Amino acid sequence: MNIVMFFFDNYMFSDFNKSSLEIACIENDIGTVKKIINLNPNLDISHCLNLAIESKNYQIVKFLLKKNISNSVLLEAYDCACINGKISIMELLIQYLNNKSIVS
């Protein structure tokens, strides 16, 4: 295996995807969010979820909630929505949390 390709595939590309995902969450670009997550489903999306909440990007928040998110990340997202006064997103998170068993 080419060492340059190994490095690109395992380090730089995932960093590039994470930065692109963060920008897409802020800019409400759901198409890009879906493409990046489908290409790399193991990306840590917790920070991106908070960025989408802060930017009031409801559809992106809704999409990210469909991913396997830990209870602690969900509770942090709810705190972020409360702090930023994002009522529609708070309601979405409450609805989602009510349908999920919360055990810390």
UniProtKB/Swiss-Prot annotation:
**ANK repeat feature ranges:** 16-43, 44-73, 75-102
Q: Does the keyword Repeat apply?
A: yes
What UniProt keywords apply to this chain's record, in alphabetical order? ANK repeat, Repeat
InterPro entries tied to this protein: Ankyrin_rpt, Ankyrin_rpt-contain_sf
Coiled coil stretches, renumbered: none
Q: What is this protein called?
A: Putative ankyrin repeat protein L677
